[in-house]
A protein has these predicted regions:
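Glycine-/small-residue-enriched transmembrane alpha-helix faces in small-molecule transporters
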Residues: 1-34, 71, 144-171, 191-195
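Loop-to-transmembrane-helix transition segments
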Residues: 1-7, 35, 55-80, 150-158, ...
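Specific transmembrane alpha-helical segments of multi-pass solute transporters/efflux pumps
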Residues: 10, 15, 45, 49-97, ...
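Hydrophobic/small/kink-forming positions within alpha-helical transmembrane segments
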Residues: 12, 16, 70-75, 79, ...
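Membrane-interface helix termini and inter-helical loops of multi-pass transporters
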Residues: 16-27, 83-86, 135-148, 197-211, ...
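Hydrophobic/aromatic residues within transmembrane alpha-helices
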Residues: 21, 32, 36, 84, ...
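Helix-helix packing/entry segments at the starts of transmembrane helices
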Residues: 32-35, 74, 78, 92-99, ...
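Hydrophobic transmembrane alpha-helices of multi-pass small-molecule transport proteins
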Residues: 44, 107, 116-138, 193, ...
Length: 289
């Protein structure tokens, strides 16, 4: 359980680092994603090499699935999140991103025909009531309100992509193991980020202040590589229900630290909405004993 707590808290610092980068220097999401993924790539390749003799061996179809899931769950979800964080605070952004367990439920119902229980439907109503409160507190007129809603939409799309990644990758993870799946999918997902950067951005985009490079290195290692493998091991040890319960620490810690460290406004209405989101997600994630 200690691993799950550490992994969740470490991972929760990611949006704060992203916001610190944006405050420090006008870095584009394309450049920031390139830095994060290219710096983390050697670590994923090292783990992939270490696990190279593991069974079962992957077929060509397996590799195609791993690549597609890495694209959806790591590249696309991260890119959308980075875009959204330009317009919404780190705390609010995490609360929206934390919707992914409820989206997993909806995707499973629509495509796998798994009917939700009454308890799960109740959780959905509570969760999205919380989201409505969070968004309504910022849904005022003018450019600022429109940009906030745009950012919230991007973060929601990120959550949807991540939920799709979890649903589609469930069977493959069970067959090849979480560590192999994480290392392979994350490594392969780096390719589109690299191609995107060299197509869109000039090399001068990498002429960044030292502080930005430090943030990028910490973002790639401390809040990406480290928590991904810690959480994978924790999930294997304690199971999904307990892991989901501990995962509630994430948006709470981000809301507190972003309010203190980034001077982000977090209103009483947003706090109430956030509490409803967390309660609803826990209701849908934690099974009755």
């Amino acid at each position: 359980m200690a691993l799950a707590v550490v992994g969740t808290l470490v991972f929760s610092f990611r949006p704060i680092l992203v916001k610190l980068v944006y405050v420090t220097y006008p870095v584009s999401p394309v450049t920031l994603l390139f830095l994060r993924m290219s710096i983390s790539l050697p670590f994923f390749l090292a783990v992939a090499w270490w696990l190279r003799g593991s069974e079962p061996r992957l077929t060509a179809l397996d590799w195609a699935k791993v690549a597609a899931l890495g694209f959806i769950g790591y590249y696309a979800a991260s890119f959308l999140d980075f875009i959204g964080l330009q317009y919404v605070g780190a705390g609010v952004g995490r609360l929206i991103l934390y919707l992914y367990p409820t989206l997993v439920l909806l995707i499973s119902f629509l495509f796998l025909h798994r009917r939700p229980t009454r308890r799960q439907l109740t959780a959905l109503v509570i969760t999205y009531a919380g989201v409505t409160l969070i968004l309504s507190s910022q849904a005022h007129g003018g450019a600022e309100g429109k940009l906030f809603m745009l950012g919230a939409l991007f973060v929601f799309a990120s959550s949807l992509f991540y939920a799709t990644y979890l649903v589609a990758g469930g069977e493959l993870v069970k067959r090849i193991g979480s560590m192999r799946f994480t290392a392979y999918s994350m490594a392969l997902a780096t390719l589109p980020a690299v191609v995107q950067f060299f197509v869109i951005e000039p090399m001068a985009a990498l002429e960044l202040p030292t502080k930005v490079w430090i943030y990028a290195i910490v973002l790639a290692t401390f809040t990406t590589v480290l928590p991904l493998f810690i959480q994978a091991e924790a999930l294997k040890r304690i199971g999904a229900p307990e892991f989901a319960l501990i995962g509630a620490l994430g948006p709470v810690s981000v809301a507190i630290t972003s309010a203190l460290g980034l001077d982000e406004r977090f209103t009483a209405v947003q706090a109430l909405g956030g509490a409803l989101v967390i309660f609803g997600v826990l209701l849908v994630s934690v099974k009755r004993s």
